[in-house]
Amino acid sequence: MITRLLKSVREYKKPSILAPVLVSCEVVMEVLMPLLMSKLIDKGIEKGDMNYVWWMGTLLLVCMFISMAFGALSGREAAKASAGFAKNLRHDMFHNLQTFSFSNIDKFKTSSIITRLTTDVTNVQNAYQMVIRIAVRAPIMLIFARCASFYLNAKVALILLGIAPVLLLGLIIVFRYAHPIFVRMFKKFDVMNNVVQENVRGIRVVKSFVREEHEIGKFTEVNNSIRNDAVKAERAINFNGPLMMASVYTAMLLISWVGAKLVVNNEMTTGQLTSMFSYTMQILMSLMMVSMIIVMLVISKTSAERISELLDETPDITNPENPVMEVKDGSIDFDHVYFSYSKNKEKSCLMDFDIHINSGETIGIIGGTGSGKSSFVQLIPRLYDATDGDIKVGGVDVRNYDLDVIRDNVAMVLQKNVLFSGTIKENLRWGNPNATDEEMIEACKIAQADSFISAFPDGYDTYIEQGGTNVSGGQKQRLCIARALLKNPKILILDDSTSAVDTATDAQIQKGFAEYIPGTTKLIIAQRISSVENADRIIVIDNGKINAIGTHDELLKDNEIYKEVYESQKKGGEE
């Protein structure tokens, strides 16, 4: 895990190395100063040698300023390294996220991904900065200060040696108790983020159903749960503070008592005792730093594991070794295809799909909710891979195509229409970044979007709010259809993408398809018979199987499911 994360350091290796080197130099200066202070007291002050006092005092000041300079430089380099590391980590996570297939994305909640990219990265960044500074500073200071204390007086130094195991035991207890709590707490952060995200996204529904109190209750429940875990974790961590302070005061009292006896017996000088107090503080401070590092690592370990999960997730769908780079035409072949989201053929949502669709053919798809219509069309651009059987586009197995090539030649307008923050032009150019204004207008005319766009004060430069909240559902659908048309695809798939437009507009869109893109294979999933009745053929899907294929007239005559849907809609229209 650590090796995987450190790959994100990359161009920030230099500051990552410089920071600990500069910290080491800072520590050397800090450890040297108590020794100089000891000499200043014993040889200067006690003997009344003011020249020695001035000389040694100046040397102490020089050491202090050098130490400060090293400290400032190490802080700057550590900040540069940790911020760069976090930037690369976010980039690597987001880049890997873009390679995910739908099945990979299904493993993570949106709120969890956001938490990993923000909170978790910040935790790891703080830990990294602490490691390249404090984790270097603490052991070096501990070793140097301990060696210097033994050099001054071994008897007093042994007191400090006995305190370390007590502190180490405390740190182990804290780590073992706190880590599982932090793991649980970060999972609850995902739940809380999910509650907030759902509430913000569905705020209009919440308001219309007067469910504010219910939503507040959901948020309060998870918020209180996080608070309870945080209290438990802090309780464990706070145990470390009193233990540290008790150790510090115990050490100081013992050193004062033993040191005073040694000074009285002329076994130790006043300057050495003063320096010993300084080294005691340095040793105990370094142990406190180790304690801080342990606490930070407890928090960041959980975050690091969650980040690694996202970084180590490999896409289920990848390019073949020698991919086909051209789609010849829009013909589609399903050869006894089975598909299951769980990769278990026994739980297939598509079973024994066998069909040939000619290039340029218009295919209507009818079926009940959950019958497998969307699953069927999502296999064509290889958003998922079939569990069994073969799927061909243009006579070539879709698994042999370059992913970008097959998806560029298959335009999908999904059930959930998504518009991004930006102008209408910017949203349309998702279909073709190089599209001219004339091409955009033509696509919008086919999609019956040009009329309402032209009615906006800013026309095609109208700004679309996040999620397309300032356009209606029908307008959003037509913009998404126009965006798909700009790809100039060989296959166009509409997944119930005209459900929010009236039947007259729907008919105009179908007429535009027939007139302007006759060579494009068109697959139209619809709930309304009127949307597909003029298709070359209509597929009736029932419980994951092809129930019937035929023209509108043929199905109306021979298929009970189609006839039932038609009669119910006809009756509803008459009423």
State each model region's role.
Residues 11-14, 78, 99-103, 119-132, ...:
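An intracellular "coupling" helix at the cytosolic face of ABC transporter transmembrane type-1 domains
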Residues 48-53, 144, 148-162, 176, ...:
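Helix-loop-helix
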Residues 26, 30-34, 62, 67-82, ...:
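Alpha-helical transmembrane segments
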Residues 325-575:
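ABC-type nucleotide-binding domain
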Residues 1-33, 37, 45-59, 73-78, ...:
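Membrane-integrated ABC transporters
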